[in-house]
């Protein structure tokens, strides 16, 4: 008779036990089933996309959102990931897509990603993302604050180099003038001493 309550208690504990993946491991507003994370058609953008997914994710669905790019390292942080559904997003093919392009290049099969086409910029519109060269993506990126900062630093160094070169030229000119003056003074002194030497030589001979 005692096994009845114990069996009911065991069944209750089994029903109340947490699933194989804790609810906290599934980022909002996605839904999770086992190692599949479905974030498709939820209007996600760069700003609203979850910053991390469960590390054991094997399949990730991001189809049908408003994603123009993915944060760097987002997919690389999922070592068990086998498939990422990325279609039906307005991808902007510039330097922000370099990490995604590198991740796609490392996939053994590119067939699932042949529908990833660039929506912008105009020069790359309609191109297939997996087959773009990295240089094409970087060239499509407008210079940002870091680029302008690097350019300003290079211009400052160039200006300092030109200033040093100008100072060196002025210093060399100054040295040449000083040498010329010294030679002129030496020649003048020599011209003054030559008659005296000749006169002394004449008196000595007499």
Curated annotation (Swiss-Prot):
Which residue intervals define the domain LRRCT in the entry?
89-143
Q: Where in the cell is it found?
A: Membrane
The LRRNT domain covers 27-55
Q: Which cysteines are cross-linked by disulfides?
A: 26-32, 30-39, 93-118, 95-141
Phosphoprotein as a keyword of this entry, yes or no, is yes
Q: Write down which residues bear the modification named Phosphothreonine.
A: 193
The GO terms this record gives for MF are: identical protein binding; transmembrane signaling receptor activity
Membrane topology of the entry: Single-pass type I membrane protein
Instruction: Enumerate the Cytoplasmic topological stretches.
Output: 173-206
Q: Where is the signal peptide?
A: 1-25
Topological domains (Extracellular): residue ranges?
27-147
Q: Which UniProt keywords apply?
A: Bernard Soulier syndrome, Blood coagulation, Cell adhesion, Disease variant, Disulfide bond, Glycoprotein, Hemostasis, Leucine-rich repeat, Membrane, Phosphoprotein, Signal, Transmembrane, Transmembrane helix
Against InterPro entries, the record matches this protein to: Cys-rich_flank_reg_C (IPR000483), GPIb-IX-V_Complex (IPR052313), LRR_dom_sf (IPR032675), LRRNT (IPR000372)
Q: In which tissues is it expressed?
A: Expressed in heart and brain.
Spell out where the chain is glycosylated: 66
Q: What Gene3D superfamilies does the annotation carry?
A: Ribonuclease Inhibitor
LRR repeats: from-to residues? 60-83
Q: What else is known?
A: Platelet activation apparently involves disruption of the macromolecular complex of GP-Ib with the platelet glycoprotein IX (GP-IX) and dissociation of GP-Ib from the actin-binding protein.
Q: Summarize subunit and interaction data from the UniProt record for this chain.
A: Two GP-Ib beta are disulfide-linked to one GP-Ib alpha. GP-IX is complexed with the GP-Ib heterodimer via a non covalent linkage. Interacts with TRAF4.
Task: Tell me, in a sentence or two, what this protein's role is.
Answer: Gp-Ib, a surface membrane protein of platelets, participates in the formation of platelet plugs by binding to von Willebrand factor, which is already bound to the subendothelium.
Entry protein name: Platelet glycoprotein Ib beta chain
Organism for this UniProt entry: Homo sapiens
Lineage at the top is:
Eukaryota, Metazoa, Chordata, Craniata, Vertebrata
The gene for this chain is GP1BB
């Amino acid at each position: 008779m005692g096994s009845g309550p114990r069996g009911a208690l065991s069944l209750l504990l089994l029903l109340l036990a947490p699933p194989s993946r804790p609810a906290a491991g599934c980022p909002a507003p996605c839904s999770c089933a086992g190692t599949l994370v479905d974030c498709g058609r939820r209007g996600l953008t760069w700003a609203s996309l979850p910053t991390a997914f469960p590390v054991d994710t094997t399949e990730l669905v991001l189809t049908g959102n408003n994603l123009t790019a993915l944060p760097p390292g987002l997919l690389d942080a999922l070592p068990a990931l086998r498939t990422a559904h990325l279609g039906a997003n307005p991808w902007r093919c510039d330097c922000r897509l370099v990490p995604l392009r590198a991740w796609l290049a490392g996939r053994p099969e590119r067939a699932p990603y042949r529908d990833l086409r660039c929506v912008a910029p105009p020069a790359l519109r309609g191109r297939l993302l997996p087959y773009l060269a990295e240089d094409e993506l970087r060239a499509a990126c407008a210079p940002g604050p870091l680029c302008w900062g690097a350019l300003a630093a290079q211009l400052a160094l160039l200006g300092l180099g030109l200033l040093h070169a100008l100072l060196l030229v002025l210093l060399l000119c100054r040295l040449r003038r000083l040498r010329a003056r010294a030679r002129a003074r030496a020649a003048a002194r020599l011209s003054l001493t030559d008659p005296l030497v000749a006169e002394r030589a004449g008196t000595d001979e007499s």
